[in-house]
Amino acid sequence: MIEKLILGRFVPGESLIHGLDARTKLLAGFYYIGILFLANNWWTYALMVLFTLMVVQMTGIKLKVFIKGVKPLIWLILFTVVMQILFASGGTIYFDWGPFTISSFGLLNGVFVFLRFVLIIIMSTVITLTTTPMNLTDAIAYILRPFAVLKVPVNDIALMISVALRFIPTLMGETDKIMKAQRARGVDFGEGNLFEQMKVVVPIFIPLFVSSFNRAEELADAMEARGYQGGEGRTRFRILHWHFGDLIAACVMILLTAGLVILRTS
């Protein structure tokens, strides 16, 4: 499961989505998550699913890659869905026992929560798969630039976010190596009760933390060796530019919002 984590990786390509400005993709991603909460019925969610599938198709990356990105988080999603089903009340009651209630409203809300999680993960994965870490850092710094007036270290925050995203697949790969080494020594991560399984997982974290600190120190040394002193006065080799495609993307998001409002109120 660990090696299937896609979030944080970049896949080179020449698709329309790859060609969009990183700021456009980042702002559109936040906007997409915001308007997703406007969806409140089957028609609105059908529109969002159709739009998301179209975006995935435009990336030139196979859909199964994005599905792999959802799989590592499926248990968290299902747990949230079950909580919605058991504790949301309203509509026709199918089962009622103590604090637990299964109703038509709870089932419907559970399906919508599942779709919402999956769509957010897929759209977030679209951004990271089609945007280089450097462009993503510059986009975050640009968006946070107004906070620089308040003496907020915008460039440092952008760098930390970018490094964190970049290190997700690296740390997951490191975890996978440690788990394989433990299995080679006879450790079985699937046996025993919950307490025993948690006890088996503990030895993974110590070498993982050591490896993480070592990688962080190596990265800091490499940045210092290249003369990095923060974002102040730093020049950039690649300058982000708005293009006509970014204007088209903004218009598409406006049309998507209008469609959601119409389907929501109809």
From Swiss-Prot:
InterPro entries linked: ABC/ECF_trnsptr_transmembrane, EcfT
Cysteines joined through disulfide linkages: none
Keywords: Cell membrane, Membrane, Transmembrane, Transmembrane helix, Transport
Gene Ontology CC: plasma membrane
GO-annotated molecular function: transmembrane transporter activity
Membrane topology classification: Multi-pass membrane protein
CDD domains, alphabetized: EcfT (cd16914)
Subcellular location: Cell membrane
Positions of transmembrane segments: 33-53, 73-93, 107-127, 152-172, 243-263
Recorded superkingdom: Bacteria
Coiled coil: none
HAMAP family in the record: EcfT
Family as reported in the entry's similarity comment: Belongs to the energy-coupling factor EcfT family.
Function: Transmembrane (T) component of an energy-coupling factor (ECF) ABC-transporter complex. Unlike classic ABC transporters this ECF transporter provides the energy necessary to transport a number of different substrates.
Subunit comment: Forms a stable energy-coupling factor (ECF) transporter complex composed of 2 membrane-embedded substrate-binding proteins (S component), 2 ATP-binding proteins (A component) and 2 transmembrane proteins (T component). May be able to interact with more than 1 S component at a time.
Entry protein name: Energy-coupling factor transporter transmembrane protein EcfT 1
Organism: Listeria monocytogenes serotype 1/2a (strain 08-5578)
